[in-house]
Amino acid sequence: VGSEMCIRDRLPEEEKKADYFLTFLADELSVEKTDILDFELTVYCKENPEFIGLNDDFISSPRLDNLTSCAALISGLIDAGRMEGINLIALFDHEEIGSHTKQGAGSILLHDMLRRILKELGREQTAEQDLYRSMLLSVDVAHGIHPNQAGKMDLTNKPVLGRGFCIKEASSQSYATDCGAVAVIQQICEKDQIPYQKFVNRSDLAGGGTLGSIASALLPVKTVDIGIPLLAMHSARELMAAADQQALKDLVSAYFG
């Protein structure tokens, strides 16, 4: 043991770190270090989500971006009662790094999947018309207005936590929203009394973007970008209003029918 420690002490610092982790990984998997050819490592915050605030009206949690949207979409699809047409959700990988991977929104995965479904339904010859009549919801979180950075927002289009989900628009088309799709969502919200608000990116500052523009370029259908406003987006713990999650879930359920 003494000679092994002496040899290890003479290794370069980076090699020591790699050796230390490989030893840990090999022990966890009950294999030899030499059996490990490669690995991927992702770091997660393991603290539990919490309701916070005077009336527990806020949620503090890791990964609200974009688990909030995934949860609302899955619930809405399960609750859907409409039997005609196709209800489909796609939970893509790699949105935070550009979406241009084989399982990201920048791939032909969704386009090909819809084509195959239409073919199996005997609608291959009318696929273009079917797609033209379709609509895409791009659901991702939005930056809520921060009390310490209020000047970063357009004063007339600021998303406030607790006032419903956001319909997101941008003249740069970083959000894929078009007026026809907005009208559909607004009508649903007004009919079912679902709270919503509009958010427009400032044209003189770089703002966020979503996979909506990427996906709709490959699948040219009416599209609207929506999502829940957050504070501290991309931090280890993010903050949202619990009522906004209910509003988003209600909208998705009504949208799927």
Where in this protein do the model-derived segments appear?
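Domain-scale recognition of functional cores that engage charged ligands
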Residues: 17, 25, 30, 63-70, ...
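A short glycine/serine-rich beta->alpha loop
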Residues: 54-64, 95-101
